[in-house]
Amino acid sequence: MGGKDFQIYMDYHEKSGTGAKSPDNIEADTKSRRKTSKTEWSLFPGFYDRIVSVFGLPEIDLFVSRTSAKCQRYVSWDSDPEAFAIDAFTLYWKLFFFDVFLPFAILPKVLQKIAYDKAIGFLVVPYWKTQSWYPLFTSLLTKVLIVLRPHTNMLNCSDRVHPMGSSLNLVAGILSGTPS
């Protein structure tokens, strides 16, 4: 069906009302409303518990969804009626002891926000010493790092395991934007 034929088809069905209406098309309607992230990786609870046993329980979880939040209070990426707020970058982080485990691509922005807000919390990041953000990460550290050795089940997203889980070294540290 070419472009013109498709447009004629669509015009006909819109005018005649023969397209499937939402109540009649339950499967498509349900799938279109479901919010699932295929990229929101989360630490397996045992690894997270190890970090919390050393650093303490955070007050708020930043950059998560309802399904991946580890704290009762969390800040979501997207509209969520149960979230404390949407978009963690709009908050003043100094008010909370937070935890962050996020897409690695925004680590530089997160580290700058910690420094700017003079905030304190813990981050879990890849042990990538050659990355441009790593010196800033180490300059904000207040305690020794917790090293999380590679493990197949270390990172999960719904029922999937991360393809790099068995080879990725992660580190966790408390960071503070207040100079010591």
Over which residues does each language-model region extend?
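Acidic, metal-ion-coordinating active-site neighborhood of RNase H-like domains
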Residues: 1-151, 174-178
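Short hydrophobic/aromatic beta-strand or adjacent loop that forms the aromatic wall/cage
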Residues: 167-172
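Active-site capping/gating segments
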Residues: 148-165
